[in-house]
A protein has these predicted regions:
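Membrane-proximal interfacial segments on either side of biological membranes
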Residues: 1-201
Length: 201
């Protein structure tokens, strides 16, 4: 670990670096570190390694401010509870969603959280590939994601659309969360072989 402290006027500027090798946390350990409301997820288990850069200021009254955090994460395994009703588009969706072999960049600054990443995901019975960007500003949550579905089903009843069993479907979603259990899909695009569908809501 590295730690640097600079004094300017009546404030201390503190910055540091910290590398973590393979950390495993269960649900209770995670709750002791990060508020569930901040993450917006009910995480059951996580295994990861990370490179962390952080900085913050401390005033003469020992009040912390301007906290910034940059993390590069190698996520081996993440399991969280599926709290969203997505069975109408992912017919075989699981009660627990699993992320494996993810490369993630996380940035936290002034109550704003952004996460970008890519890797494997078990939404249904087989592995799919996923890329994503998550933005959380106070009570607002946005998700932009690309999901490549190969051996899993996908359906859109509204358009009477069903994925071909032997083809690869590229699904792009722009989603906003309005409360803990409700998602609004702003844009959905599908690409399967020569078929393309774009839906803006």
């Amino acid at each position: 670990p590295e730690l640097t402290t600079l004094k300017k006027n009546n404030e201390y500027f503190i910055s540091g670096k910290l590398n973590n090798k393979s950390i495993k946390l269960d649900k209770n350990e995670i709750k002791n570190i990060v508020k569930e409301e901040l993450l917006g997820l009910d995480i059951q288990k996580i295994i990861f390694s990370s490179q962390n850069n952080f900085s913050f200021k401390v005033d003469k009254n020992l009040k912390f401010k301007d906290f910034k955090l940059l993390i590069d994460i190698e996520l081996d395994n993440l399991i969280f509870t599926n709290s969203f009703n997505l069975k109408n588009i992912f017919p075989k969706i699981k009660k627990k969603i699993i992320f494996n072999k993810q490369k993630i960049k996380l940035k936290y600054e002034e109550e704003n959280l952004s996460i970008t990443g890519k890797g494997e995901v078990f939404l249904q019975n087989k592995i799919d590939k996923i890329k994503y960007e998550i933005i959380k500003r106070k009570n607002e949550f946005q998700l932009n994601t690309t999901l490549n579905i190969s051996q899993n089903p996908f359906e859109l009843y509204l358009l009477t659309y069903q994925k071909n069993k032997n083809s690869v479907l590229e699904l792009n979603l722009k989603v906003k969360q309005v409360d803990k259990n409700e998602l609004i899909f702003n844009e959905i695009s599908l690409k399967e072989k020569k078929n393309m569908i774009l839906v803006k809501i």
